[in-house]
Every structure is written in C-alpha cells, then in structure tokens.
Amino acid sequence: MAAASGYTDLREKLKSMTSRDNYKAGSREAAAAAAAAVAAAAAAAAAAEPYPVSGAKRKYQEDSDPERSDYEEQQLQKEEEARKVKSGIRQMRLFSQDECAKIEARIDEVVSRAEKGLYNEHTVDRAPLRNKYFFGEGYTYGAQLQKRGPGQERLYPPGDVDEIPEWVHQLVIQKLVEHRVIPEGFVNSAVINDYQPGGCIVSHVDPIHIFERPIVSVSFFSDSALCFGCKFQFKPIRVSEPVLSLPVRRGSVTVLSGYAADEITHCIRPQDIKERRAVIILRKTRLDAPRLETKSLSSSVLPPSYASDRLSGNNRDPALKPKRSHRKADPDAAHRPRILEMDKEENRRSVLLPTHRRRGSFSSENYWRKSYESSEDCSEAAGSPARKVKMRRH
C-alpha cells in the first residue's frame, strides 16, 4: 500500500506530511505579522490625521475651536470679576430673631411718624414700592439734580434731615462696634430703605465723593439678594444676569469695600423682593464732601449772600428740583418702569423738554387744556368776539 502511494516507507510519508504542516503554520504566522503591520500603519496614520476621509469634519472642528476659546475666555473673565467682588465683601450673622423683632418694631415706628408728617422735609423720600428715611446726613441724587451723573450729588445743609434715632445707636451701631465691624464714632449717616414686594433700586455706586468706605448694611423683615454688575433696561423693565448674586439673610450684616464698593455697581432686583424687606445703611460722610449751603432753595427771594453760600470749595452747587412722588403704589407698580426710582427715561425727558412740558410738574395734556381754557376766559372777560382757529395738519 505504501508502494502504491509512491512512498517506499511509512516513515517517508510521515516526514513529508510534517514538513507540509510546518509550511502552513509558517504561512499563518507571516499573514498575522503582515496584518499587524498594516494595523499599526493605519493607527499611525489616524493619529497624524484624525479625519483622513472626511474633510468637512476636520473643517468644522477647526472652526469651532475659536468659539469655544472665546466662551471659555468670557467665563474666565466673569469668574475673575466675581472673585474681585467677593474680595471686597464681608458678611456675618450678628442679630438674633428676638433682636430683629425689636429693631423691626422700631422701623415700623419710623414709618408711622413719617406718615404723620413728624419728620423734616428732606428726611423722607417716597417712591412706589420703596421709601427712604435719611438720618444724620441726607444727600441729593437721581432726578433731584438738574445736572445728573456721577459726582453731582450734594449733601443737604446741616439740620435739613433729622438726627439719627437713639435706638439705631443702641440696638444696631453699638453691636457693630462691639464686634469690631466699624470703629467707635464712625457712623454719622443712617438710611432706612423700606421695600414692598416687587420694589427695587437700579444699579448704582454709592457716591465716592460723598461717603467714606466701608459701607455697612443690616437686613430685616425677610431674606433677599444683592446683585453686582447688572444692567437695567426700561420699557419693559429687564435686568441682565449679575456678575455675582449675594444672598442677604434677615439679621445679617454686609460690609462693602474695595472693588465691591467702588469698581462695580450693585442693585436690588424686583424679583428678589418677594416680601417686605428693610435695610439700615450705615455710612460716614467725607470731610470734603460738597454740600448745599442754603436752606431755602425753592424760595424766589434769596439773601444777598446766596451766591457766595452756594460755593462749597471749588464746586458750585446745582439748584435742586423737588420731584418726589406721594402716590400710593398698587401691586403692579413694579412692572411700570416709568415710575421706578431713578427712571432713566424720565431723567432724559426732563432734561430735553422745556420746563412747562416736564412730567414732574404736570402732564402736557392737562397743561394745554388749562392754557386753552384760561385763554378763553380772558377773551370773554375782555369782551372780544370768539375767533375760529384753523388747525394746520402736519
């Protein structure tokens, strides 16, 4: 059988079969090595060029990189500014619930006395959903000035506002001195801001030429938030996202200095006043702060020394225009920007329009109606016949 198959010996047949198996195994190993080499080359090519086939994907990635870097840069800038703001803020919880209740009862007494007219004229400043009560020192701001803008604020003459109530010294200032928040004798100006739900105050910086730093405030009645770096837009009212929103709890003390007090604005947003809230602001006026020296600014007859009294240092004090609102606010008043405190549109109109057209005195519609009626009365009294006036359309 071995001879028929061409092999003379069975050992020769086995030997020939072994060599063939070795050849097949060697072929498989070579193929595997070749496949591994191809895979390695493909991986190297992929690492050198992430998208070797589709150029559109690579182009999209290149285009999106600058956008992502700009966004990241803006976020870094915002975080850096927020860090600067935080560096100028100190907060502490000093007043217990019982102490808050005592102080809040005193604030209610201030409101009651103001409603009875027991304070000086410049002590009380009313606005829809927000009343301010100045003690010790008061100053002009916002629509009260003929020339508006930073640096135009002036202190009232001494005695034009009431003295700081004794309870503010005993219940508030003394506790701050004991905890070394402020030094003894630092405070000579106390302002109580009383907010109703939806009330607000637009972004501002406390006048640097009027007040020393730090600025100390104590919150009562409810929790709220103090926002930094917001931009207000009116009609309809909108408020941009703040650089930093600082929670302000009932009974907490907030101290502003440095960047937080001088380099960025702060505000109270309408959405952050959900319940009645009051804040007592304690400050010290600068020795060189400009001051109004005359006590009868609205009088038509002025003393001969008025011109010299108007001067405070090298600054001439602008005439005051009393523009206070005594209207009671309805619940929707916060959404009517025309009556908000320091309304920019109102300020612009009062500067551009002539005196008889300004809304602070009376509406233009009522003015022209009254003028027309008075002219008719005069013509009838004089006995002159009525004239027909042809109105020209423009």
UniProtKB/Swiss-Prot annotation:
GO terms for biological process: cell differentiation; gamma-delta T cell proliferation; membraneless organelle assembly; mRNA destabilization; mRNA processing; regulation of mRNA export from nucleus; regulation of mRNA processing; regulation of translation. Binds 1 Fe(2+) ion per subunit. There is a cross-link at K57 (Glycyl lysine isopeptide (Lys-Gly) (interchain with G-Cter in ubiquitin)). It comes from the Eukaryota. The modification Omega-N-methylarginine is found at R359. The modification Phosphotyrosine is found at Y71. SUPFAM superfamilies: Clavaminate synthase-like. Residues 59-83, 328-349 have a biased composition (Basic and acidic residues). One of its GO terms (cellular component) is nucleoplasm. 2-oxoglutarate binds at N193, Y195, H204, H266, R277. This is RNA demethylase ALKBH5. It comes from Homo sapiens.
